[in-house]
Amino acid sequence: MTTRPVFPSGLYGVTPDWDDLDQLSQAIEAAARGGMKVLQWRHKTCPAPRMIGMAREVKRACHANGVLLMINDHWRVAEAVGADGVHVGRDDDSPNAVRLALGPDALIGVSCYGDINHAKEMLAQGVDYIAFGTMFASATKPHAIPTDHQILTQARALVAQTGSNAKVVAIGGITAQNAEPLVAAGADSLAVVGGLFLASDIEASARALTHAFG
């Protein structure tokens, strides 16, 4: 019997909408050297015909550097390229439907925004992480209202109460300068876009973010 994978704690990189695969591969390598454990490939403007080809190259770069790959929204792309899992939002297919399609070993994470009741529903569907945010003002989602950090503490208690192995993920406007309070509040993982990949030194930024975990 195989053991179901566990979503790792630590730095969780989320890509900007980059089309340049060389740039992306180099960034993944640098972030991995700095301690990134998982990457979410998120490209909201990628044309459908290019998506599988790009995702396959991102997977190659991730696995070459010991990084797990999550695909944002598109579980069929995750299935096609053999990604490690998928991140789904409120308007995407349910975790139960995704699990049925991808099988028991796929990692599935969900956006819970600032809604602890939604998190409870998602944990009942066996997700591998529940993500909350935006934690701070974010250029990625400029109109999102920041979420009280106390939601992370509530989420950690909820996970313990349900006996789940799910991780608590914080996302939104996170940088090395504001990361530690989120970990102290209960975040197992920090999902970072601009604070990692738009930094002048990606490896150094990854190391600084990883340092927040002690």
How should these model regions be labeled?
Residues 135-138:
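A short, flexible beta-alpha/helix-coil linker loop
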Residues 1-95, 100-128, 144, 150, ...:
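Conserved N-terminal beta1-alpha1 strand-loop-helix module at the mouth
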